[in-house]
């Protein structure tokens, strides 16, 4: 590419205002790129439950310059306690601290995380437009001409598809690529008052995998992965009772907690689907990141982490190269193997729980994941 430096005279367009899109906006603004983020949801809503963030995410937040505000919004912990299906503790896995003076891991509410990232992206100078999607785009030598769903148009140097597992951008760029695949499992989530002294992630093994994650000093959330043959639809009315029933065969401590699941509106249910693009994640001036390229199951708690790391690496490579082709190729080389490991290792746990593969030792898998993600990106 010749002429003006990309992202300087014309902005970079980020499609998707979730975790990956917002961290991309912050990272790009740090490098001096002009950024516009569009998000299809006019309310910019997120699930009201929590999310697990591992040590590599805390390191990334430090690189983004927002670590202290981020940590203050959640609950830190350094240990994963693993329990057998009957409730007996079988392992205690210490997570590595990658930053002195900060916890190894963090549980944080998704709304709190959205607030930290959205406020930080705007403060960094990113333009964020809500209730807008891409209607069409044309690519030429000097950039992209994009038409939006609100009738407006714009010129951009690069388009980043950070629009999730059902990515509109992926479908447009790679129409022949396989779509998301249902795993046979779903995840249920629900918030509870915190347990005194609960300063670890507690993970329960079994056909139904359950975890308890602190997200503030007085709040935690429960997640449960359940077999869901045929990918059924559950009506919202009565879904709290359905979730309670799913936990009826779990450890006594989980059954006792389940009695508090009474609010249908508080239940978050999501079928688990995965996708892993083994070919390039880019074509021309369009590039994918996060779930749009490599959606994983939550068994290792690294889906958001991989998207955040993608954002940092992509911004770095765009700053280091004079052409989009060179930058995108370098980004893909650095990210593909790491993201594929997370997708495959998480899916192996899922298949083991479903009886479709060998049972995976969760403590061993978690320790291995900590070691892999502690490595520089």
Task: Give the ranges of each region predicted by the language model.
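Residues in the short beta-alpha loop(s) of Rossmann-like NAD(P)-binding domains
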Residues: 41, 50
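Conserved Rossmann-like nucleotide-cofactor binding loop
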Residues: 20, 43, 166
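Conserved N-terminal helical subregion
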Residues: 2-12, 54-174, 178-185, 189-191, ...
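Flavin-binding catalytic cores
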Residues: 235-268, 332, 337
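Conserved mid-domain beta->alpha element of the FAD-binding
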Residues: 13-38, 160-161, 243, 266-352
């Amino acid at each position: 590419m010749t002429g003006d430096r990309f992202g300087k005279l014309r902005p970079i367009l980020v499609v998707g205002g979730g975790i990956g899109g917002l961290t991309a906006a912050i990272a790009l603004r740090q490098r001096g790129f002009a950024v516009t983020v569009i998000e299809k949801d006019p309310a910019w809503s997120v699930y009201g439950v929590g999310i697990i963030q591992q040590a590599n995410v805390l390191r990334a937040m430090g690189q983004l310059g927002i670590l202290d505000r981020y940590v203050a919004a959640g609950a830190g912990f350094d240990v994963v306690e693993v329990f057998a299906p009957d409730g007996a503790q079988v392992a205690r896995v210490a997570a590595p601290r990658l930053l002195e003076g900060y916890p190894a891991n963090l549980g944080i509410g998704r709304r709190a995380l959205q607030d930290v990232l959205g406020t930080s992206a705007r403060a960094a100078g990113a333009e964020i437009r809500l209730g807008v999607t891409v209607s069409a785009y044309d690519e030429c030598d000097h950039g992209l001409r994009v038409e939006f769903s609100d009738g407006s148009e714009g010129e951009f140097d690069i388009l980043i598809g950070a629009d999730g597992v059902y990515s509109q951008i992926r479908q447009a760029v790679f129409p022949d690529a396989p779509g998301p695949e249902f795993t046979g499992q779903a995840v249920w989530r629900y918030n509870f008052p915190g347990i005194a002294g609960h300063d670890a992630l507690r993970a329960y093994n079994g056909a139904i995998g359950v975890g308890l994650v602190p997200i503030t000093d007085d709040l935690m959330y429960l997640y449960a992965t359940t077999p869901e043959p045929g990918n059924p639809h559950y009506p919202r009315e009565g879904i709290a009772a359905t979730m309670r029933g799913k936990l009826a065969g779990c450890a006594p401590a989980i059954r006792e907690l389940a009695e508090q699941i009474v609010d249908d509106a508080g239940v978050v249910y999501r079928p688990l689907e995965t996708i892993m693009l083994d070919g390039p994640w880019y074509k021309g001036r369009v590039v994918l990141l996060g779930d749009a390229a490599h959606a994983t199951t939550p068994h290792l708690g690294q889906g958001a982490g991989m998207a955040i790391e993608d954002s940092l690496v992509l911004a770095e490579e765009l700053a280091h190269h004079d052409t989009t082709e060179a930058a995108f190729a370098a980004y893909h080389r650095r990210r593909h193997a790491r993201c594929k490991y997370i997708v495959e290792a998480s899916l192996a746990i899922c298949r083991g729980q479903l009886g479709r593969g060998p049972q995976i030792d969760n403590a061993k898998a978690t320790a291995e994941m900590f070691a892999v993600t502690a490595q520089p990106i």
